[in-house]
Structures are given as structure tokens and as C-alpha cells.
Amino acid sequence: MNSSPAGTPSPQPSRANGNINLGPSANPNAQPTDFDFLKVIGKGNYGKVLLAKRKSDGAFYAVKVLQKKSILKKKEQSHIMAERSVLLKNVRHPFLVGLRYSFQTPEKLYFVLDYVNGGELFFHLQRERRFLEPRARFYAAEVASAIGYLHSLNIIYRDLKPENILLDCQGHVVLTDFGLCKEGVEPEDTTSTFCGTPEYLAPEVLRKEPYDRAVDWWCLGAVLYEMLHGLPPFYSQDVSQMYENILHQPLQIPGGRTVAACDLLQSLLHKDQRQRLGSKADFLEIKNHVFFSPINWDDLYHKRLTPPFNPNVTGPADLKHFDPEFTQEAVSKSIGCTPDTVASSSGASSAFLGFSYAPEDDDILDC
């Protein structure tokens, strides 16, 4: 799938009456009845992610179906439109999920995404408790590559956590869920929205101070710590206590790790964002840290490195790496129906102008 040519500026969202308009776009031919919706493979605040098979060619996709009513009720349409905008910019990076196309009905929004069935990093961590350093290094390197690419587009990710890191059928990382991304953040710029997931919030976010790209490198440190030790670095079941720990408790690294790993964790999880690794030269500082010295970054980017773990999926219908809580849920028949257009208010339609997107072409994944 191709988006707009490299170097072509994307249209800037315009706002009126709280609605978000990404500019002219349309996908009039796409509709829910194009797919057989087979299984629920994920759930979120506003809808579900389903394994879907396109009737025309038998291709498998992950289709994220969101309820407009729920989004509008919480006034979150800007996050949904930001996710759509960011997804269009990410299609050329090997470790970011690709948007094939998007469309809408009067009641729902549909993201048609790459189908990735190697499981969430969270799923594998829950099962294995922790990873050895070589495996953690491989995943951290691929995630850092993806974050560095987003930063090169002036995008802060802001929600890095194991649940948003998928593995593909070969075991490579795929970063997903761009709803909290902030676009248009230049290297010297800051932003101040309080958002993220409690276990991975950086101190500057908790202090409600202006923050910059270094917030993502804190999150990388938190995820790496969790991969190596089984829990986030300042974890407590009491969220208030966890926030206190993030703000004031010195980082405690259990024994058994290399000096390089300990130094990287200390550098990424520095409470002063100005002193944090990545705060000056961004991704270049991460790449050059001694912990990543075994990594050939060019080979990594081109997927010439063999992943340390193979999910061993037998094909698209192999759902063993998805939570049975999702896959055993019945698929609502309404998801695959094209409803009567008269049934929806014009307000819901105007709130998502520019959401629909049709690609110039449509490639099929290798697995």
C-alpha cells in the first residue's frame, strides 16, 4: 500500500465546532459487507479488533471497529483522527502496523490494518515472566527503531507499553495503536497533555510539566525493565504509591544483569528529562549505547536478523497467541452490516470528515 509520496506534506487537520476535518478524502466503495468477520482478537475503550477475511480475494486483515457514539460521548474524536493521520505516515516502516484503508458507516468507523498474529509482547511476558538479555535487546532495538522513525516525522508516541507491541508471524516487533500520538512536535518543541498508561508515565508527565520526545525514551526504559525483570520499574498495585515511586524513588535494578543493561536502564529512566538518554540526539543516542553494540542496525531495519523467538503460527487462522477471553466472544452480526444511512445523525458524520481513506494499491502480507 502506498500513501502520499515522500516529501509531500500531509493536509493539516482543521477544526470547527469540535469536529476534526482531515481534508478531502473518500472511500465510497468500501463497506462492512466486503468482509467475513471471523473472530474478536482485541478490545478497547470504543470498540473491538476483529480478524476479518475479505470476500473478494480471501486476504486476512485486522479490522478495528469503533463506535462513533462512544467516541463523541467522551469527546475523543481528535484522538481517533490523529490515529488515522499517523497510520498513513507509518506504512513504510517495518516495525509499525500498516493501515490498508479506512471507511465509515453512520454508526461506526473501520480501520483495515495489517493482520499480526504472533501475539502481544504482554501476552508472552505474562506466560514467560521475563526474557533473557539477547531477546529483550532485540525487541528493544526494533521498538527504538520505530520510535526513532516517528520522531523523525515530528510525532511523539506517548503510549509505549507491552500491550501495544505485537509480534508478527516471524517474531519481529510491530508497534500498534496510535491514538495518543502527538503530531507536529519539532525537536525543540514541548507539549503538555496528561496522557499515557500509569505504569509507564514519565515523571515530567506526572508533574504536569511541558515534555518533549524524551518521554518516549522513558517508556522504552520502562518496557525494557519489564522485559528483563517481569514488572514495570516502579510498580505498585496502589496507583498513587506508584506515582510517588516514579517521582521520588531511586531506580532499583535487581542483580544478574550486565553492566551495559544496568547503565542503559539508568540512562533511560533518568527522572530529569534533560539528562535522559535520547534527550539531545534522540534515537542516535540510543543506537550508540553499548547495550546495543551487538546490533547491526541496517540488518535490523531490513529484517535480516533472525528473531530470538518464533511464534510458530500455522497460518492466519492460528489464534493461539491471542487471549481466549477475546477469541471466545461471539462476533456481533451488526459489525458486518451496512446500516441504513438515514438512521444516523448528521452530527456523527460531520465529526469524522476525512476519516475514510482509499489506497492507490493494496499489497498482501507475506503471513
UniProtKB/Swiss-Prot annotation:
GO terms for molecular function: ATP binding; potassium channel regulator activity; protein serine kinase activity; protein serine/threonine kinase activity; sodium channel regulator activity. Highly expressed in liver, kidney and pancreas, and at lower levels in brain. Its EC number is 2.7.11.1. Keywords: ATP-binding, Cytoplasm, Kinase, Nucleotide-binding, Nucleus, Phosphoprotein, Serine/threonine-protein kinase, Transferase. The active site is at 159 (proton acceptor). InterPro entries: AGC-kinase_C, Kinase-like_dom_sf, Pkinase_C, Prot_kinase_dom, Protein_kinase_ATP_BS, Ser/Thr_kinase_AS. Activated by phosphorylation on Ser-356 by an unknown kinase (may be mTORC2 but not confirmed), transforming it into a substrate for PDPK1 which then phosphorylates it on Thr-193. Its main location: cytoplasm. GO terms for biological process: intracellular signal transduction; positive regulation of transporter activity; protein phosphorylation; regulation of cell growth; regulation of cell population proliferation; response to oxidative stress. Residues 35-292 form the Protein kinase domain. GO terms for cellular component: cytosol; nucleoplasm. It catalyses: L-seryl-[protein] + ATP = O-phospho-L-seryl-[protein] + ADP + H(+); L-threonyl-[protein] + ATP = O-phospho-L-threonyl-[protein] + ADP + H(+). Two specific sites, one in the kinase domain (Thr-193) and the other in the C-terminal regulatory region (Ser-356), need to be phosphorylated for its full activation. Gene3D superfamilies: Phosphorylase Kinase, domain 1, Transferase(Phosphotransferase) domain 1. Residues 293-367 form the AGC-kinase C-terminal domain. SUPFAM superfamilies: Protein kinase-like (PK-like). The modification Phosphoserine is found at residues 10, 334, 356. Serine/threonine-protein kinase which is involved in the regulation of a wide variety of ion channels, membrane transporters, cell growth, survival and proliferation. Up-regulates Na(+) channels: SCNN1A/ENAC, K(+) channels: KCNA3/Kv1.3, KCNE1 and KCNQ1, amino acid transporter: SLC6A19, glutamate transporter: SLC1A6/EAAT4, glutamate receptors: GRIA1/GLUR1 and GRIK2/GLUR6, Na(+)/H(+) exchanger: SLC9A3/NHE3, and the Na(+)/K(+) ATPase. This is Serine/threonine-protein kinase Sgk2.
